[in-house]
């Protein structure tokens, strides 16, 4: 949504990421507070120095439950999520952890979502061997060298309508055709 559309809605609460509330996007929290609108910024978007975790997401869900007076629904959702994780871990405990790559397409390189990211934490929590490097990006050559068993594509907020194009881009890269994830149709 753009600023004009949001202003026309006359919200009393806006929920978003840190990047949502800048002068280039939907303005700052001060802008909205002057219009009697509260702002909730997800903790996971604040650029924490520590790793982003599922526990932070559980906190986010609990916070929204409190804000909207839906505590029981929030706790039920968290419980379902935790049960799904426990089930997956139990079902895969006897298997070798798959080598998992979490990436976002950025030109000819990929932004890497490693252990300190929420995606990487989810992968590790679900019994995956998460591929990580010292740098925030990974080249196609490095993807070939790492040879992941599964690739998860991260599609950012403004690119949801392009998800199929992004998937097709990865699936049709000649240099990636020998990668296990592509050969075994495990790109998600």
Outline where the language-model segments fall:
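Small-molecule-sensing regulatory modules
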Residues: 86, 124, 138-141, 146
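Extracellular/periplasmic catalytic domains that process cell-envelope and extracellular macromolecules
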Residues: 7-8, 32-34, 93-96, 115, ...
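Short hydrophobic beta-strand segments
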Residues: 14, 99-104, 151-153
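Short, solvent-exposed loop/beta-turn-alpha elements that line the ligand-binding surface or hinge
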Residues: 1, 132, 180
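Acidic/His-rich segments in extracytoplasmic proteins that coordinate ligands and/or metal ions
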Residues: 1-67, 141-145, 149-151, 158-172
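Alpha-helical, coiled-coil/dimerization segments enriched in small aliphatic residues
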Residues: 111-137
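Extracytoplasmic substrate-binding proteins
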Residues: 28-105, 185-188
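Short beta-strand->loop
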Residues: 170-185
């Amino acid at each position: 949504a753009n600023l004009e559309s949001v202003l026309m809605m006359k919200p009393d609460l806006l929920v978003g990421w840190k990047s949502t509330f800048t002068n280039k996007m939907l303005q700052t929290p001060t802008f909205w507070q002057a219009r009697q609108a509260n702002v909730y910024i997800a903790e996971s978007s604040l650029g924490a120095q520590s790793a982003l975790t599922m526990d932070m997401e559980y906190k986010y869900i609990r916070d929204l439950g409190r804000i909207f007076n839906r505590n029981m629904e929030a706790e039920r959702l968290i419980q379902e999520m935790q049960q799904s994780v426990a089930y997956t871990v139990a079902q895969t405990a006897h298997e070798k952890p798959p080598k998992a790559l979490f990436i976002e397409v950025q030109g000819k390189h990929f932004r890497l979502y490693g252990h300190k990211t929420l995606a990487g934490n989810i992968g590790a929590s679900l019994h995956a061997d998460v591929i990580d490097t010292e740098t925030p990006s990974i080249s196609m050559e490095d993807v070939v060298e790492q040879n992941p068993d599964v690739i998860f594509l991260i599609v950012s907020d403004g690119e949801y309508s392009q998800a199929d194009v992004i998937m097709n881009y990865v699936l049709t890269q000649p240099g990636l055709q020998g990668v296990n994830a592509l050969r075994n149709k495990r790109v998600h």
